[in-house]
């Protein structure tokens, strides 16, 4: 989860993920999915421009937007990258900004642990799982 205008952790996270992308982008079973945490500003067109600026193939790295409540619920419940207790009463007051990545298999199951996208050692922990798709 990131947002295109983030001046803090998002650029570092996405640069780390781009290294993973570069290593595995030619694998047929490899796909990165990044969700915006700011759907009010990050429209599909804005995300497409962002992907283009990163120089990635959007068939291999997908940038998604949607309804804020659905995006945040997915982060907390499906991916486990934010504590469900962080939910606030009004979704408009909620802001999920996390440096964590989840490795999800093609069946939608989170594999392994949740990884800190700011730490090189954490990113390296993804490699054994990704090598299995080769």
Residue ranges and their predicted role:
Residues 48-98:
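Short, internal strand/loop/helix patches
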Residues 26-29, 55, 103-106:
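Short, flexible turn/loop "capping" segments at secondary-structure junctions
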Residues 1-17, 33:
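Short active-site neighborhood of thiol/selenol oxidoreductases, capturing the structured segment around
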Residues 87-134:
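Thiol-/selenol-based redox modules, centered on thioredoxin-like
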């Amino acid at each position: 989860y990131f947002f295109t205008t983030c001046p803090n952790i998002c650029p570092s996270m996405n640069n780390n993920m781009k290294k993973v992308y570069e290593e595995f982008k030619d694998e047929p079973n490899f796909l990165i999915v990044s969700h915006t945490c700011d759907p009010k500003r990050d429209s599909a067109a804005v995300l497409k421009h962002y992907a283009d600026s990163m120089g990635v193939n959007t068939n291999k790295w997908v940038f998604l937007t949607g309804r804020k409540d659905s995006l945040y619920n997915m982060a907390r419940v499906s991916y486990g990258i934010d504590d469900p207790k962080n939910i606030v009463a009004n979704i408009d007051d909620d802001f999920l900004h996390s440096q964590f990545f989840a490795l999800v298999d093609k069946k939608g199951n989170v594999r392994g642990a949740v990884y800190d996208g700011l730490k090189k050692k954490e990113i390296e922990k993804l490699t054994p799982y990704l090598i299995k798709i080769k």
